[in-house]
Design a protein with these regions (language model features):
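Protein kinase-like catalytic domain
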Residues: 30, 117, 128-129, 240-243
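CheY-like receiver
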Residues: 79-81, 90-93, 97, 117-120, ...
């Protein structure tokens, strides 16, 4: 399948086989009404694929709503998704439609679906199975006709095994699985993306675009990119503002690549967790803290191994349950 028109329409940069396969799979499943689960690391560019799916579906003239499940507090997520009746909780001064009601006839994209509370997962499963939902504070079931597309950076089978994600919901969402490859598996795309981001920054800051020496190109390609495309974009943005010399060499690049020595690996190295240094894992989560705070909290939960900790000894992020 020729995916070039799709990439041009949605501004998707790259030509790696893994990326083209993901786009092709999305385009093929778009005309159906099947649920789709998009899996990939944080920052790998999952967010554009639901837009492609909606645009090439029979629902393209209906609403498209994207919801970041990890950014909504647990106490209000049911209200956000399914709506509420007046007086159903403190502050509910009037009835309000939820996203599933607003998206009727269209597509709803549930990003970070792995962060949904178990109680909300039960409600979502009902929507997928019957097309029905109940507003918070109501006993009346309402119908909705939406297509659900979900995305996650969580290893879902592990989440199912741990009991943090319902097995029946996982298989209901995973009717058509789509895998978005991380940037380290798209080596042929790295320089293309660098040039694209450099041109963007040049136009924004009215300065010549950054270029790379050949050695710097090789370093960029060999780097593991734990923060994926988001990290590369931020790196180009920083250098575009700070660096006076527009040709970036290895010495300059090294200043912007954290832990280069642990990030540079042979091309034949495995991609398993055992091949990533502890420092790099910490960086991966801290780097995306603002958008992936729930992933950081999950790491803390793993560290305490499910054992209760006194609030005073908990890390501040875990203790305060921040939502950004």
């Amino acid at each position: 399948m020729n995916v070039q028109p799709i990439k041009q329409r949605f501004g998707i940069i790259g030509s790696s086989p893994g990326l083209d396969r993901a786009i092709s799979n999305v385009a093929q499943v778009a005309p159906t009404d099947l649920s789709v689960l998009i899996q990939g690391e944080s920052g790998s560019g999952k967010e554009v694929l639901p837009q492609v799916l909606h645009a090439y579906s029979a629902r393209k003239h209906g609403p498209y709503i994207a919801v970041n499940c990890g950014a909504i507090p647990e106490g209000t997520i049911d209200s956000e998704l399914f709506g509420h009746e007046k007086g159903s909780f403190t502050g509910a001064h009037e009835a309000r439609k939820g996203y599933f009601e607003v998206a009727n006839g269209g597509t709803i994209f549930l990003d970070e679906v792995g962060e949904l509370p178990l109680t909300t997962q039960v409600r979502l499963l009902r929507v997928l199975e019957t097309g029905e939902f109940i507003r918070v504070g109501s006993s009346k079931a309402q119908k909705t006709n939406v297509r659900v597309v979900a995305a996650t950076n969580v290893q879902m089978l592990q989440a199912v095994a741990k009991g943090t994600f319902r097995e029946d919901l996982y298989y209901r969402l995973n009717t058509v699985p789509i895998h978005v490859p991380p940037l380290r598996e798209r080596k042929e795309d790295i320089h293309l993306l660098f040039r694209f981001f450099a041109q963007e920054a040049a136009a924004r800051y009215k300065a010549p675009p950054l270029t790379l020496t050949e050695e710097a190109q090789r370093m960029l390609i060999a780097y593991r990119w734990p923060g994926n495309i988001r990290q590369l974009r931020n790196l180009v943005e920083q250098m575009s503002v700070i660096e006076q010399t527009r040709e970036v060499d290895v010495k300059t690049l090294r200043d912007y690549l954290p832990e280069e020595s642990t990030a540079l690996v042979p091309a034949s190295a495995g991609g398993g967790i055992e091949s990533i240094s502890e420092r790099e894992l910490i960086y991966k989560f801290l780097y995306d803290m603002k958008s992936d705070l729930n992933a950081l909290k999950e790491q803390v939960r793993s560290l305490v191994a499910g054992q209760p900790m006194p609030a005073a000894t908990m890390p501040p992020v875990y203790r305060e349950e921040l939502y950004i």
